[in-house]
Amino acid sequence: MNGLHDMGGQQGYGPVLIEAHEPLFHGEWERRALGVTVAMGASGLWNIDLARSARESLPPLDYVQGPYYAIWTKALQNMLIERGLITADELAQGQPLTPPVAGVRVLQAAQV
């Protein structure tokens, strides 16, 4: 099955343009997006394969428009909502509206 995430090697897309001296992250938000996504893996509610599937299941336009780490952020948001850790309203308002889910593992700073 080839989706938009399987573009590598397909005809008609042209070469991959490599930015000389490209930084690992183009902004602090990208660093945080990756960090939060990886840290949430400690919850035990998903693994690397499910996280990848969540990214690959996004609408195709999400892959071709916007920054790379926006894909990671949107997939994380979807996984958090699907597993009941946050609601869509909480995400939209940027604050908790319901009590935290009990029994979810939390990554502690000492574990990093």
PLM feature segments, named:
Residues 1-112:
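A charge-rich, low-complexity, intrinsically flexible signal that marks solvent-exposed coils, linkers
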